[in-house]
């Protein structure tokens, strides 16, 4: 009945009962953020309680088949999801949505009728990223490029979005996005498994140049990928524009010689793989 006092009375009761101040404050802050733009819990203890509460609600309601439909959201699950994402991202917590939902679902035992509850909750939460970033003015295609890779660690998801948003401003972005679309179409038609690049098979200067460039970059960016420094990764990959353009201008991928054709497909497969470690930039407009 007194929604404005949610958490407040619990805090005062805890203080009255002699609980630690951190516990008392956490009882109040577990409901944060209460609305869009509201402040977050200040301590990690309060953040942990807030996340536990939100994931328990999301998993339980999805588990009984009561996911939001259309504009109806009687259990405020959209707010709970966005609140959880904000806490994880803005506090840069190394948490994975799948791990959290699995742990939450396990606590319900066999009481959840929805057998796909983990995937459903994770997909729902990733979908809330779209609304969040659109409110920030980030282009929809940037969000889609990251969603295509389905990273489930929110802080990592955010780092990818920031990196792709930056990449989109570079002079080479449009050409490389178009090239990646072309590469995707070519690889989709490959009729055999694609192996590794063999430099000794290269005959054209343009294909050798691209092969050497992607192999060098694969080694160079790996530590950056592991560090989550996606902006630097894409800055380095942007340098591929010239060799990529030269490759498509001077090399016929579907050569008659099977070994030559497979090696050229391997070059393109490696090129695509470099970008896919961050996002699917082929969806950029």
From Swiss-Prot:
EC number: 6.1.1.14
GO molecular function: arginine-tRNA ligase activity; ATP binding; glycine-tRNA ligase activity
Reaction catalyzed: tRNA(Gly) + glycine + ATP = glycyl-tRNA(Gly) + AMP + diphosphate
Pfam family, one: tRNA_synt_2f
Keyword Manganese carried by entry: no
UniProtKB keywords: Aminoacyl-tRNA synthetase, ATP-binding, Cytoplasm, Ligase, Nucleotide-binding, Protein biosynthesis
SUPFAM superfamilies: HD-domain/PDEase-like
GO BP of this protein: arginyl-tRNA aminoacylation; glycyl-tRNA aminoacylation
InterPro entries referenced in this protein's UniProt entry, alphabetically: DALR_anticod-bd (IPR008909), Gly-tRNA-synth_bsu (IPR015944), Gly-tRNA-synth_heterodimer (IPR006194)
Keyword Disulfide bond on entry: no
GO cellular component: cytosol
Protein's cellular compartments: Cytoplasm
Family under the similarity heading: Belongs to the class-II aminoacyl-tRNA synthetase family.
UniProt subunit comment: Tetramer of two alpha and two beta subunits.
PANTHER family: GLYCINE--TRNA LIGASE, CHLOROPLASTIC_MITOCHONDRIAL 2, GLYCYL-TRNA SYNTHETASE
Descriptive protein name: Glycine--tRNA ligase beta subunit
Gene, per the UniProt record: glyS
């Amino acid at each position: 009945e007194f929604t404005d006092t949610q958490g407040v009375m619990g805090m005062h009761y805890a203080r009255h009962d002699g609980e630690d101040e951190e516990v008392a404050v956490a009882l109040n802050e577990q409901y944060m953020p209460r609305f869009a733009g509201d402040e977050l819990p200040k301590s990690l203890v309060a953040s942990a309680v807030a996340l536990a509460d939100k994931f328990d609600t999301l998993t339980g309601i999805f588990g009984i088949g009561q996911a939001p439909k259309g504009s109806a959201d009687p259990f405020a699950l959209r707010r709970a999801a966005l609140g959880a994402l904000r806490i994880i991202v803005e506090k840069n917590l190394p948490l994975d949505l799948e791990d959290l939902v699995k742990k939450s679902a396990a606590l319900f035992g066999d009481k959840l009728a929805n057998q796909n509850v983990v995937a459903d909750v994770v997909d729902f939460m990733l979908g809330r990223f779209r609304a969040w970033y659109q409110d920030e003015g980030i282009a929809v295609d940037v969000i889609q490029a990251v969603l295509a890779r389905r990273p489930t660690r929110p802080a990592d998801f955010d780092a990818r979005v920031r990196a792709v948003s930056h990449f989109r401003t570079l002079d080479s972005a449009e050409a490389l996005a178009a090239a990646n679309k072309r590469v995707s179409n070519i690889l989709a038609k490959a009729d055999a498994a694609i192996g590794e690049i063999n430099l000794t098979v290269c005959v054209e200067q343009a294909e050798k140049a691209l092969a050497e460039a992607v192999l060098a970059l694969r080694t160079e960016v790996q530590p950056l990928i592991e560090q989550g420094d996606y902006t630097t990764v894409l800055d380095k990959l942007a340098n591929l524009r010239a060799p990529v353009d030269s490759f498509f201008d001077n090399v016929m991928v579907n050569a008659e010689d099977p070994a030559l054709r497979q090696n050229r497909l391997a070059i393109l497969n490696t090129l695509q793989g470099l970008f896919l470690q961050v996002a699917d930039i082929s969806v950029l407009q």
